[in-house]
């Protein structure tokens, strides 16, 4: 967290036109932007846990997190607001598997997403494709189905996304994890998004 906050402070100083030299925890020597943006970009903080989100609320310009079928992202959003993020934008990445049948949605999720069910602490230590494949063999379908929203019913997705909006998420990024992107785009464009945004 110290490195993250120090990096954010350095970026903000650079965007303000300052020359920055720091020793620790991030070293910079007379860093300077020769061309600055007219408007500094938002500095979003990424959080998967309420503790990190609460810490980010006090200094980040916004939050980005990942939706979970169990609704853990509601706790993350609440902690961000509690920590000082009230009124700041919140971005949500929604991993989902949509197809026209539940079986296709489940099999697409299993086929494409089973390597992504492990925590970052495990994944960041894998070095070869073989290590990823070995890990995939240990994943069961239930592990995948607990990590993403899976349904062939557009009404389920409408309900879930409305809940996300009610939680205060201002930007939703929908990621259909299976390969059937054409059906996803067509059906969400015709049946899901109009229900949410009119």
Predicted features by range, described:
Residues 1-198:
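Active-site-adjacent structural elements that line small-molecule/cofactor binding pockets in enzymes
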